């Protein structure tokens, strides 16, 4: 498991983005943010909800729904968004720090 790996959401609704530091990989949980199809997602908030193209569809990062899940929920990664790291960090910073 690596930071910014994307996993299929086991509930069948989009994906989960792993945002936990690799240094904490020994823990039995991972901090994730849901990625939900843009056409069913709430109205986006600039910076907080960047949009990603995955498998020919647009998915919104619902940073405000960040949560910890058991590593058992995360199977094999299907994507990695390391190239969008700065946007993900900015979204988390906005949620946690207000900046």
Task: Map each language-model feature to its residues.
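Absolute protein N-terminus
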Residues: 1-3, 99
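Residues at structural and domain junctions
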Residues: 2, 18, 74-78
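Compact nucleic-acid interaction/catalytic patches
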Residues: 3-6, 10, 15-48
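Short conserved beta-strand and strand-loop elements enriched in small hydrophobics
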Residues: 50-53
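C-terminal terminal-subdomain/extension
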Residues: 55-99
